[in-house]
Structure formats: C-alpha cells, structure tokens
C-alpha cells in the first residue's frame, strides 16, 4: 500500500514539475 502511495505521489510531482517548466518556458518565449 505504501508503495502505491509513493508511486502516485511521484507521478503527481512529475506532472507538476513538467507543467511548471512548460508554463515557464511558454511565458519566457512570449516575453521575448
């Protein structure tokens, strides 16, 4: 059970970090 929770948390963090990096990249491109 603990492994599943850690896996879900890992996936959630990966999605959040990816979304933030993509969003920041788009803002940087638009700013130029």
Swiss-Prot record:
| Pfam families on file | PetM
Q: What does this protein do?
A: Component of the cytochrome b6-f complex, which mediates electron transfer between photosystem II (PSII) and photosystem I (PSI), cyclic electron flow around PSI, and state transitions.
The name this protein goes by in its record:
Cytochrome b6-f complex subunit 7
The subunit field of the Swiss-Prot or TrEMBL record says: The 4 large subunits of the cytochrome b6-f complex are cytochrome b6, subunit IV (17 kDa polypeptide, PetD), cytochrome f and the Rieske protein, while the 4 small subunits are PetG, PetL, PetM and PetN. The complex functions as a dimer.
Family from the record: Belongs to the PetM family.
| Segments crossing the lipid bilayer | 5-25
Q: Which domain of life is it from?
A: Eukaryota
A single Gene Ontology CC annotation of this entry is: chloroplast thylakoid membrane
Its predominant location is plastid
